[in-house]
């Protein structure tokens, strides 16, 4: 379970994403399936902590160490302040603070990287990305203030009825208004 843009990012690095079923009880990848799917070409195991559940990563860290695979954890849904800074054996721990996260900054992220050379390389790449302006952030703040206000049940019901009256596709209109990633090429700087 992840957003489709993650697969796009993986492919952009010349890698092939291989999805693995998760256990319905633990929302963790099934280790026995990983054992079946691993090959000499396997490079990275990406585990997403879903719905605020922090998956015990030690068995996956052991699996990655045994198979010489990087362990990357997506902590976007598991940020809990000082309670969890990522697993100590994860090679990369990613935390994002988008508008729909439980702990939001309306954007931005933190990456904890064990390997200092990899961290430096990532920092060098990040430096060429354009910096968002204060105006961009103000527009975003205004947009999500109104979305939050309009999500109040009494107003939401009226808005849905108005959208139907105007023959607007309710689902696609809401999706477009709350889109976390830009449309088009995600990897264009």
Describe the role of every protein-language-model region.
Residues 79-82, 92-107, 112-189:
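Active-site region of PLP-dependent enzymes
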Residues 67, 89-90:
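A short helix-to-beta-strand connector/capping loop
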């Amino acid at each position: 379970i992840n957003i489709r843009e993650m697969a796009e990012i993986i492919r952009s690095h010349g890698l092939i994403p291989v999805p693995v079923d998760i256990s319905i009880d633990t929302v963790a990848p099934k280790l026995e399936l990983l054992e079946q799917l691993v090959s000499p070409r396997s490079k990275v195991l990406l585990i997403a902590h879903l719905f605020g559940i922090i998956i015990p990563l030690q068995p996956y860290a052991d699996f990655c160490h045994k198979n010489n695979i990087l362990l990357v954890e997506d902590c976007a849904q598991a940020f809990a302040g000082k309670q969890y800074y990522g697993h100590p054996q994860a090679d990369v721990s990613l935390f994002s603070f988008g508008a729909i996260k439980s702990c939001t900054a309306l954007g931005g992220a933190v990456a904890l990287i064990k390997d200092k050379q990899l961290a430096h390389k990532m920092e060098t790449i990040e430096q060429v990305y354009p910096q968002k302006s204060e105006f961009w952030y103000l527009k975003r703040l205004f947009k999500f203030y109104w979305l939050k206000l309009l999500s109040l049940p009494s107003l939401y019901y009226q808005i849905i009825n108005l959208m139907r009256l105007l023959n607007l596709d309710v689902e696609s209109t809401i999706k477009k208004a709350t889109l976390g990633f830009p449309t088009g090429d995600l990897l264009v700087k």
